[in-house]
Amino acid sequence: MLSAIVEQISNNGYGIFKGFYDISTIEKFSELCEKHSINRPFTKANGRKIMVKSAKNLVAKTRDFDDFFSDSRLIAILERILSPVGHWGIKISDTGIKNVVAGLRAPLMHRDDDLYPQLARGTPFTVKSLLAIDAFSEEVGATKVVPGSHNWVRAVDPSEKAVSVLLDPGDLLVMDGRLWHQAGENIRSDKVRRAVNVYYCAGWCQPGHGIHCGMPEGEFSQLPSKIKTFL
């Protein structure tokens, strides 16, 4: 299973791990998403502001998601893609709860590796993983990707065909940081599209939230080893 997903990512820039977690586990994660999400301002398609429940830098605020962030199956995939160098390993760059609601402005196509000033060659600097809490469909704003674009050195062309990634709750989407992608637009006022996001980088790169994801040294020193090793 893991080798097949790594091959998907190598060939297409993204891979899907079907049924990464069962429904009972996802129901627990759904409750945790409600617990840790707060209202944040986002922009609607019409330019007006909207308050959306989401969360940023989860790993610095709670231990409730550590089992996912450090899941051995996920780490095995990430290490195959990021090819860690020596003692540097891989590090958590960002974690959060994504929530695509009706009317939310869809972001532009982008590459996560563009956080850094030079595009990676051979292996990416980063890998993003999205755990579907709700179903991903076109009408609720499923993530859109341009297959194979992780091999490009050029920018994406607006005419390029993007594919919506359809997921069931519990499925895991893993994306090479060089892949051009964006969240879709949710046109269903009665549904949301939530996902727990974890974004890893090569250990020698600067993480998005800085060393230890911004945690004070005292808090960091008390972390369980299963998550501490990735911070």
Language model: regions and residue ranges:
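Non-heme Fe(II)-dependent double-stranded beta-helix
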Residues: 1-12, 17-109, 115-116
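Non-heme Fe(II)/2-oxoglutarate
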Residues: 47, 179, 184-231
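A structural signal for short, well-ordered beta-strand segments
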Residues: 94-97, 129-131, 196-200
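Short Ser/Thr-interspersed hydrophobic loop/turn segments at strand-loop and sheet-helix junctions
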Residues: 98, 135-136, 178-179
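Catalytic core of non-heme Fe(II) oxygenases with the double-stranded beta-helix
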Residues: 104-167, 205-215
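Histidine-centered metal-chelating micro-motifs
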Residues: 115, 173, 178-182
